C-alpha cells in the first residue's frame, strides 16, 4: 500500500520526468492578492503567470500546494469531522502549462499517471467534459479508449472554469473513480450524483479563452493548462479506503490523539478525533506561514479553527491543554515535505498551549451562558443572533463553535442576527480611511513593468549612481515628460535608491539631470514587484523619457537606516536566545531615527530580560567584526541555518546576511538571516543599541522599539537627566533614588489607607472617637443613608457591607460625590429582600441626580449620575421609595 508521502512523490516525479519544474508549495497567505483570505487551490500561486503579468523561466510546472478552506466563499469548516472528504487543510497536486502544451498532452499525462503510475483499473474510471467541448470528448476516446457512455457531457458551470468576470477561462474535464454498486450514488450529471459511489479525483482546466465582458469572449493566443488533484482524496482511493480519515496520515495523527487524550476514536468520540486531526494540520501550517491568532481577518479564522478543535478535545475529557502535544506527531508525518514545521515547532507548541489555556478559562462561562439561553428552546429552534454574538464578543466563541455545540441538540443559530450585530460593531469601530487618489492603479504599473522591465538596484555599493529615465507616472497615468513643480513617480533603469520593502523605509534624496533639471525624492517605493519608483517633485527644469541623471540618496540618512536594520537582526537573535526559540519576526519598521520589531511571544518581556537582550546586542556590536553577505538558493540558505520569515515567498536566489560571532561559539555567526536590505559593513558601525519601549501589539505578539548610535546616546543622556532631576527634587543621591521612591510610595499607600478609614468613619456618622451614629427607622425597617464627599463608586461597597453588619436587619444607601458626579449604592439585608429590591431603590436615587437606570442584585445595586450637587435629593428619593 502506497503511503501519502509516496503518492505525493510519485506525482511530482512523473511530471519532473516530463520536463516540468517542481515548484515548492507557496505559503498559505497569498502574496500580493488581497482578494483571497488563503491559498485555496493549486493554481493560485501561478495566477499572474496565467494572466501574463508575470513571466516564468519554465513554461511547465508541477507542485503539491498547501491549501486552506475555512473562511469566505470556500468554507468547509462546519462539515469537517462529520463527512468522509471535507478538510480545512489539504494538499492540491497539480501540473501546469503556461502557453506550452494543451489538451491532448494534458489528457495523455493524466491518463498515463492514474492508470500507469498509480495503477487504477481503467474500467473503474469515467470522465466528464464540458458539453460543448467536442475536442476533449474526441481526445478521451483517442487516448484512453473510453466509450461515449463513460464520457459525460456537463452543460453547467461545474465544467467551465473562469478566474472572474473577466480574464482567462475555459472548459474543464474531470476524472471520476467508481467505488462500485455497493456504495449509493449515481454518475455525475445524474439526479443522485451527490452520492459517494463516484468520486472526482482530478480536474483538468483548459484555459483557451479570455472573457472580455458578459457576452464577449476571444481565443487566447497561447492556451494554458491548470489541473488539480486532492492528495488526501487520491490517497484514500489508492489505499482502498472510502474515507480520507482512514488513510495512513490521518490514522497516525488520530492514534497520537488517542494516546494524548486516553480516549479511543470510536462511537461518539470518532468525529471529535477527526476534527482534532484535521484542525491540527490547518492550525500548524497557518502559524508556520506567519498567521497568528487574533480577533480579525486571517488571525480570526485561525482562532476559530483552533477553538473548534480545543472544544472537541474538551468533549473528550481534556482538562489541560493537549493540542500542543500533537505537534511532534504532525512533524513526523509531514515535516520531510514541509520543513517549516520543524523550524516553527517551538512557536507552534507555545502558541497552542497559551491559546488553549486562555480558551479553557472562558469555555466554562460561555457554555453556562449557552445552557441558560437554550433552557427553554426545543429541537429545531434557533438561538438569537444577539446571544450568539455575545458569546463571540465576550467569551471568544466563534459562530461555528456555537453552531457545533447546538448541533447535538438539533438547534441552529440566527445567522442573520449574528451578522447584523457583527456588522454594527465593525461599523462602530472602523476608523475612517483616506486615500490621496493620486496613486496609479496596479494595471498601470504592470503595463510599465512590461515595457521597461525591472530596476537594477546598485545601492549595496553606495548611495550614488547614474540612471536613464525609463518611465514617468503622474496623476495616476503614464507620461512622456514632466515640468517644473509637477509631482510624479520616476523609474530608472538602475538606481542606488532603496525601495521600501522588508520593513526598511524607502530612501530620500536628489536626482540631477544632465541638462540641469532637479527632482527631489521624498520617498522610494517598489512597484510591480521589482521597479523602484522615486516619488517626489520636479523642483527645477523639464525632463523627458530617456534623460540621463545622477541619482544621490541621502547618505547620512541611509547610514542611520543601515545601523537600525542591522540592529534588528541582532535583536532578533538576542530575543530568541533570551526568550526562546519560539520567537519569530512578525513585522518590523526600520527608519533613520529608530527601529520597531514585532515578534511572537505570549507575555511581556521583563526588565531583566530587556537588559539581557541589550547586553547581548551591544556585546556583538563591540566585536566590530565584518558583516558578510552571500547569495544562494533559499533551500541552501535555510540548510545553512539562516532564519527565514514564516510565510515569506522567496525568489530563486536570496541574500544571506551573517553578523557577529556567537557568544559561546566564536566559529558560528551570532545572526544569520535572509535579507535584501542595506546593512552596516562592520557590527561596530551600529555603535550602541538601546531598547526604549516594550508593548503588546495583539494576542501573542509583542513589540520592542529601539534606537542605535547617536540617537541611543542622546536618549540615554536624557533618561539620566530625568533621574538626576528627580534625585535633586528628593534631595537624595542618584544611587539611592529607587529606594527613596519606593519609601515614598509605601508612605503614600499608608496615608491613603488612613484617609479611606477616616472617610469611612465619617460616612458612618462617627466623630473623632469613631463611634457610628445609629440608624433611623422608615416603614418599619432600619435605614442608614449618607452623602459622602470625595468617595468614588468602588469604595461604596465596603460602606454598605459595614452598615448592614451594624444594623443586622435593614437597608443602607450611600451616595459618593467626586469631581461633581454622584455614585450611588444600596444594600438590603437578606431578611428584607422579599419586601425591598436594591435595584429599584438605587434607580429612584439615580433619577434624582440625572442618572438613568442602575444594576445589580436584589441585595446590592449601584448606579451613577452626572449631578453630584443633588446628592441629598437622591438620598431623599431613596427614602421616599423605601417609605412606599
Swiss-Prot record:
Cofactor section: Zn(2+)
Q: What PROSITE patterns does the entry give? A: AA_TRNA_LIGASE_II_ALA (PS50860)
Name used for this protein in its record:
Alanine--tRNA ligase
Q: What is stated as this protein's family in its record?
A: Belongs to the class-II aminoacyl-tRNA synthetase family.
Q: What EC identifiers does the entry list?
A: 6.1.1.7
The main place the protein resides is cytoplasm
Q: InterPro entries per the record?
A: aa-tRNA-synth_II/BPL/LPL (IPR045864), Ala-tRNA-lgiase_IIc (IPR002318), Ala-tRNA-ligase_IIc_anticod-bd (IPR018162), Ala-tRNA-synth_IIc_core (IPR018165), Ala-tRNA-synth_IIc_N (IPR018164), Ala-tRNA_ligase (IPR050058), Ala_tRNA_ligase_euk/bac (IPR023033), DHHA1_dom (IPR003156)
Report the protein's function. Answer: Catalyzes the attachment of alanine to tRNA(Ala) in a two-step reaction: alanine is first activated by ATP to form Ala-AMP and then transferred to the acceptor end of tRNA(Ala). Also edits incorrectly charged Ser-tRNA(Ala) and Gly-tRNA(Ala) via its editing domain.
Q: So where does Zn(2+) get bound? A: 565, 569, 675, 679
What is the annotated localization of this protein? Cytoplasm
Co-factor binding comment? Binds 1 zinc ion per subunit.
Q: Does the keyword Secreted apply?
A: no
What are the entry keywords?
A: Aminoacyl-tRNA synthetase, ATP-binding, Cytoplasm, Ligase, Metal-binding, Nucleotide-binding, Protein biosynthesis, RNA-binding, tRNA-binding, Zinc
Give the Gene Ontology MF terms in alphabetical order. Answer: alanine-tRNA ligase activity; aminoacyl-tRNA deacylase activity; ATP binding; tRNA binding; zinc ion binding
Biological process terms in GO annotation: alanyl-tRNA aminoacylation; negative regulation of DNA-templated transcription
* Keyword presence, Chaperone: no
Gene3D superfamilies for the chain: 2.40.30.130, 3.10.310.40, 3.30.54.20, 6.10.250.550, Bira Bifunctional Protein, Domain 2 (3.30.930.10), Threonyl-trna Synthetase, Chain A, domain 2 (3.30.980.10)
Reproduce the free-text note on domains from the UniProt record: Consists of three domains; the N-terminal catalytic domain, the editing domain and the C-terminal C-Ala domain. The editing domain removes incorrectly charged amino acids, while the C-Ala domain, along with tRNA(Ala), serves as a bridge to cooperatively bring together the editing and aminoacylation centers thus stimulating deacylation of misacylated tRNAs.
Q: Which cellular components does GO assign to this protein?
A: cytosol
Amino acid at each position: 500500500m502506497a503511503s501519502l508521502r509516496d503518492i505525493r512523490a510519485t506525482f511530482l516525479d512523473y511530471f519532473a520526468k516530463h520536463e516540468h519544474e517542481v515548484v515548492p508549495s507557496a505559503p498559505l497567505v497569498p502574496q500580493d492578492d488581497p482578494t483571497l483570505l488563503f491559498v485555496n487551490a493549486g493554481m493560485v500561486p501561478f495566477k499572474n503567470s496565467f494572466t501574463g503579468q508575470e513571466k516564468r523561466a519554465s513554461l511547465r510546472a508541477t507542485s503539491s500546494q498547501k491549501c486552506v478552506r475555512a473562511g469566505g466563499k470556500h468554507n468547509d469548516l462546519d462539515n469537517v469531522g462529520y463527512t468522509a472528504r471535507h478538510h480545512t487543510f489539504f494538499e492540491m497536486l497539480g501540473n501546469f502549462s503556461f502557453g506550452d502544451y494543451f489538451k491532448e498532452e494534458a489528457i495523455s499525462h493524466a491518463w498515463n499517471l492514474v492508470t500507469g503510475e498509480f495503477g487504477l483499473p481503467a474500467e473503474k474510471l469515467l470522465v466528464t467534459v464540458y458539453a460543448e467541448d467536442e475536442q476533449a470528448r474526441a481526445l478521451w476516446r483517442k487516448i484512453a479508449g473510453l466509450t461515449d457512455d463513460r464520457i459525460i457531457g456537463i452543460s453547467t458551470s461545474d465544467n467551465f472554469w473562469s478566474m472572474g468576470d473577466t480574464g482567462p477561462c475555459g472548459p474543464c474535464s474531470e476524472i471520476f473513480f467508481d467505488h462500485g454498486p455497493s456504495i449509493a450514488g449515481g454518475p455525475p450529471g445524474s439526479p443522485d450524483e451527490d452520492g459517494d459511489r463516484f468520486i472526482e479525483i482530478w480536474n483538468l482546466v483548459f484555459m483557451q479563452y479570455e472573457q472580455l465582458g458578459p457576452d464577449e469572449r476571444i481565443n487566447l493566443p497561447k492556451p494554458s493548462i491548470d489541473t488539480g488533484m486532492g492528495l488526501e482524496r487520491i490517497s484514500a482511493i489508492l489505499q482502498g479506503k472510502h474515507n480520507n480519515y482512514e488513510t495512513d496520515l490521518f490514522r497516525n495523527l488520530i492514534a497520537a490523539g488517542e494516546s494524548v487524550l486516553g480516549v479511543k476514536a470510536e462511537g461518539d468520540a470518532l468525529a471529535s478525533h477527526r476534527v482534532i486531526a484535521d484542525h491540527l494540520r490547518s492550525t500548524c501550517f497557518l502559524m508556520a506561514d506567519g498567521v497568528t491568532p487574533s480577533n480579525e481577518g486571517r488571525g480570526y479564522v485561525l482562532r476559530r479553527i483552533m477553538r473548534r478543535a480545543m472544544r472537541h478535545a474538551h468533549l473528550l475529557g481534556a482538562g489541560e491543554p493537549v493540542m500542543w502535544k500533537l505537534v511532534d506527531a504532525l512533524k513526523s508525518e509531514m515535516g520531510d515535505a514541509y520543513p517549516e514545521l520543524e523550524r516553527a515547532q517551538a512557536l507552534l507548541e507555545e502558541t497552542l498551549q497559551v491559546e488553549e489555556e486562555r480558551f479553557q478559562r472562558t469555555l466554562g462561562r460561555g457554555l453556562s451562558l449557552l445552557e441558560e439561553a437554550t433552557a427553554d428552546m426545543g429541537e429545531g429552534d434557533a438561538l438569537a443572533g444577539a446571544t450568539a454574538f455575545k458569546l463571540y464578543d465576550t467569551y471568544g466563541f466563534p459562530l461555528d463553535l456555537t453552531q457545533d455545540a447546538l448541533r447535538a441538540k438539533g438547534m441552529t443559530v440566527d445567522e442573520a442576527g449574528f451578522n447584523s450585530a457583527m456588522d454594527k460593531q465593525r461599523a462602530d469601530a472602523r476608523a475612517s480611511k483616506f486615500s490621496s487618489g493620486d496613486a496609479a492603479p496596479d494595471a498601470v504599473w504592470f503595463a510599465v513593468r512590461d515595457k521597461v522591465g525591472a530596476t537594477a538596484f546598485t545601492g549595496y555599493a553606495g548611495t550614488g549612481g547614474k540612471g536613464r529615465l525609463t518611465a514617468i507616472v503622474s496623476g495616476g497615468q503614464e507620461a512622456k515628460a514632466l515640468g517644473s513643480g509637477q509631482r510624479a513617480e520616476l523609474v530608472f533603469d538602475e538606481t542606488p535608491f532603496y525601495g521600501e520593502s522588508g520593513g526598511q523605509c524607502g530612501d530620500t534624496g536628489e536626482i540631477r539631470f544632465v541638462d540641469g533639471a532637479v527632482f527631489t525624492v521624498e520617498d522610494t517605493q517598489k512597484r510591480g514587484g521589482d521597479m523602484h519608483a522615486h516619488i517626489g517633485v520636479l523642483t527645477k527644469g523639464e525632463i523627458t523619457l530617456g534623460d540621463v541623471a545622477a541619482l544621490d540618496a541621502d547618505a547620512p540618512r541611509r547610514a542611520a537606516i543601515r545601523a537600525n536594520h542591522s540592529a534588528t537582526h541582532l535583536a532578533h537573535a538576542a530575543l530568541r536566545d533570551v526568550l526562546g526559540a519560539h520567537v519569530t519576526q512578525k513585522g518590523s519598521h526600520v527608519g533613520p531615527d529608530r527601529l520597531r520589531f514585532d515578534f511572537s511571544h505570549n507575555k511581556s518581556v521583563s526588565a531583566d530580560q530587556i537588559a539581557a537582550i541589550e547586553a547581548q546586542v551591544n556585546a556583538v556590536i563591540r566585536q566590530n567584526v565584518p558583516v558578510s553577505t552571500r547569495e544562494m538558493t533559499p533551500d541552501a540558505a535555510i540548510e545553512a541555518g539562516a532564519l527565514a520569515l514564516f510565510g515569506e515567498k522567496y525568489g530563486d536566489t536570496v541574500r544571506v546576511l551573517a553578523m557577529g560571532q556567537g557568544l559561546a561559539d566564536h566559529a558560528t555567526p551570532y545572526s544569520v538571516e535572509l535579507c535584501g536590505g542595506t546593512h552596516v559593513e562592520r557590527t561596530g558601525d551600529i555603535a550602541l543599541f538601546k531598547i526604549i519601549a516594550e508593548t503588546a501589539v495583539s494576542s501573542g505578539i509583542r513589540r520592542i522599539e529601539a534606537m542605535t548610535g547617536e540617537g541611543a546616546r542622546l536618549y540615554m543622556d536624557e533618561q539620566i537627566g530625568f533621574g538626576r532631576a528627580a534625585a535633586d527634587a528628593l534631595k537624595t543621591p542618584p544611587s539611592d533614588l529607587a529606594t527613596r521612591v519606593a519609601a515614598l510610595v509605601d508612605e503614600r499607600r499608608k496615608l491613603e489607607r488612613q484617609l479611606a478609614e477616616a472617610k469611612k468613619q465619617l460616612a458612618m456618622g462617627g466623630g473623632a472617637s469613631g463611634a457610628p451614629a445609629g440608624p433611623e427607622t422608615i416603614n418599619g425597617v432600619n435605614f442608614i443613608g449618607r452623602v459622602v464627599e470625595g468617595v468614588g463608586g468602588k469604595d461604596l461597597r465596603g460602606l454598605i457591607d459595614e452598615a448592614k453588619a451594624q444594623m443586622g436587619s435593614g437597608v443602607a444607601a450611600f451616595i459618593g460625590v467626586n469631581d461633581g458626579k454622584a455614585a450611588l449604592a444600596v444594600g438590603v439585608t437578606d431578611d428584607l429582600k422579599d419586601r425591598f429590591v436594591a435595584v429599584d431603590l438605587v434607580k429612584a436615587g439615580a433619577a434624582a441626580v440625572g442618572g438613568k437606570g442602575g444594576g445589580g442584585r436584589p441585595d446590592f445595586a449601584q448606579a451613577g449620575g452626572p449631578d453630584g450637587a443633588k446628592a441629598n435629593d437622591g438620598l431623599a428619593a431613596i427614602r421616599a421609595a423605601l417609605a412606599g
